[in-house]
C-alpha cells in the first residue's frame, strides 16, 4: 500500500496537514516515472490479488522533481480556456514528463487550461539539484496566459 502525508515545515518543525492511503498529486508524478516495472502488470496484480508476487523495482540512481503549473489566482479564482504552447517539445524527450490535470481540448483541437492545477512538469537528473534545474528549464518551455508556479520546489537542496 501507499500512505501519503501532507506536511508543512514551520518554525516549530514539520506539521501534518493531511494523510491519505493513496498517492497524492504531484507525489505520484515523481514516483511513477522511476518505476521500472510495467505499470499494467502492477495494476493487474492488484486486481488479481497477487501484488505480493511482484518484485517492484525503482530507479534509485536518479532523482526526480515535479513543478506544478497553475492558473494565476488558484485556488480561489482563476480564468480558463488559455491555449497551452510548448507541449510538443516534450513528446520524445527522455527524462521529462508533462502530466495533464486541468486541461482540455477546445473546439479547434488545441489544448487549453481548464482548471487551477494545469500541468505537472516532471524531470529527472543525476542529483536532486540537477533534476530541479531540469524541471525549471522545462517549465520555461511551456507557456499559457496566467501561468503561475512556485519557485521554491526542492530549493532546500540548493541551499544545503
Regions found by a protein language model. Name each.
Residues 92-102:
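Hydrophobic alpha-helical segments of multi-pass membrane transport proteins
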Residues 9-11, 58-61, 91-93, 111-117:
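A structural signal for short secondary-structure junctions
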Residues 103-108, 112-160:
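Generic C-terminus detector
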Residues 3, 15-17, 117:
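Protein kinase-like catalytic core scaffold
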Amino acid at each position: 500500500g501507499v500512505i501519503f502525508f501532507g506536511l508543512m515545515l514551520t518554525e516549530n518543525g514539520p506539521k501534518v496537514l493531511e494523510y491519505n492511503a493513496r498517492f497524492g498529486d504531484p507525489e505520484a508524478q515523481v514516483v511513477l516515472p522511476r518505476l521500472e516495472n510495467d505499470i499494467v502488470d502492477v495494476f493487474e496484480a492488484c486486481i488479481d490479488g497477487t501484488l505480493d508476487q511482484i518484485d517492484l523495482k525503482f530507479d534509485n540512481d536518479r532523482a526526480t522533481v515535479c513543478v506544478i503549473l497553475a492558473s494565476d489566482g488558484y485556488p480561489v479564482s482563476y480564468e480558463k480556456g488559455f491555449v497551452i504552447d510548448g507541449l510538443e517539445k516534450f513528446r520524445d524527450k527522455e527524462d521529462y514528463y508533462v502530466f495533464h490535470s486541468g486541461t482540455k481540448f477546445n473546439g479547434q483541437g488545441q489544448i487549453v487550461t481548464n482548471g487551477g492545477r494545469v500541468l505537472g512538469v516532471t524531470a529527472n537528473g543525476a542529483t536532486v539539484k540537477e533534476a530541479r534545474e531540469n524541471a525549471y528549464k522545462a517549465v520555461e518551455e511551456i507557456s499559457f496566459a496566467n501561468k503561475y508556479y512556485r519557485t521554491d520546489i526542492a530549493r532546500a537542496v540548493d541551499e544545503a
